[in-house]
């Protein structure tokens, strides 16, 4: 494929993406106990390793009462390190998170 834009680097505001392939957010149902699991980590790092420029973790709640489903992330102080591990893993594979 001559000059296929999908595989070219792209600037998105201040962020430079290695290509234009982005995995959009979808409900993975892998946040067991409403926190990032090893399955969630493995899934998103595999997407990044596969060549996606960016992967978006599924929607999450900012309050306990906002949790709609089991397996949905709930942002609170106790999971900051888990989220950092997930983000660092995605970045280590060359993708944005």
Predicted regions, residues:
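Flavin-dependent oxidoreductase catalytic cores
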Residues: 1-97
